[in-house]
Amino acid sequence: MPVDPEKLAKLQKASVAKKVGGSRVKAKKNVKTEQDDTKLIEALGKLKAQKIEGIEEANFFKEDGKVLHFNRVGVQGAAQHNTFALTGYPQEKDVTQLIPQILPQLGAENLEILRKLAEQIQAGKNPELNAGGAEGAEEDIPDLIEGQKFDDVE
């Protein structure tokens, strides 16, 4: 089959202007947190967890003095498995911000803890970070002498 050079030049010129195909842009996968929620719901379903009503808020106290505060919290529990799930959006706050809200909820047995907390806030130090606090806890531990039994030490 003979090739006509004029037609070939015309086709080549036309093909330069047209772009067939192109670079493929891969679709970005959208990872949703709903997958985690469905896994959690399935796990709680296997444990036969039931929704617990009447809990309006929850507070988790951290060692550094901060508090994870859940204003609106959903609670599900499976008492036979000793498993409870708290769901919601936490806010990290200082203990001092939450004291007015926590005071009415505490009973008389917690007044001593509140006094200690107030002293810590006024003093501006944390007893766990203080080396003297660790030494005070070790005073109750007896020293063992070589050759003595643990039960014999008083």
Curated annotation (Swiss-Prot):
| Residue ranges annotated for the NAC-A/B domain, each copy included | 34-99
Q: List the disulfide bonds.
A: none
What highest taxon heads this organism's lineage? Eukaryota
Q: Does the keyword ATP-binding apply?
A: no
Q: Where mainly found? A: cytoplasm
UniProt entry tagged with the keyword Transcription: yes
> Which residue ranges does the record annotate as region Disordered?
125-154
Report the record's Gene Ontology biological process terms: protein transport
Write out the annotated subcellular location. Cytoplasm; Nucleus
What are its GO cellular component terms?
cytoplasm; nucleus
Note the Gene3D superfamilies from the entry.
Nascent polypeptide-associated complex domain
The family database entries (InterPro entries) matched by this protein are listed as: BTF3, NAC_A/B_dom_sf, Nas_poly-pep-assoc_cplx_dom
Q: Which UniProt keywords apply?
A: Cytoplasm, Nucleus, Protein transport, Repressor, Transcription, Transcription regulation, Transport
**Primary role:** Component of the nascent polypeptide-associated complex (NAC), a dynamic component of the ribosomal exit tunnel, protecting the emerging polypeptides from interaction with other cytoplasmic proteins to ensure appropriate nascent protein targeting. The NAC complex also promotes mitochondrial protein import by enhancing productive ribosome interactions with the outer mitochondrial membrane and blocks the inappropriate interaction of ribosomes translating non-secretory nascent polypeptides with translocation sites in the membrane of the endoplasmic reticulum.
Subunit structure, as described in the record: Part of the nascent polypeptide-associated complex (NAC), consisting of EGD2 and EGD1. NAC associates with ribosomes via EGD1.
Q: What is this protein's name?
A: Nascent polypeptide-associated complex subunit beta
Instruction: Give the originating organism.
Output: Debaryomyces hansenii (strain ATCC 36239 / CBS 767 / BCRC 21394 / JCM 1990 / NBRC 0083 / IGC 2968) (Yeast)
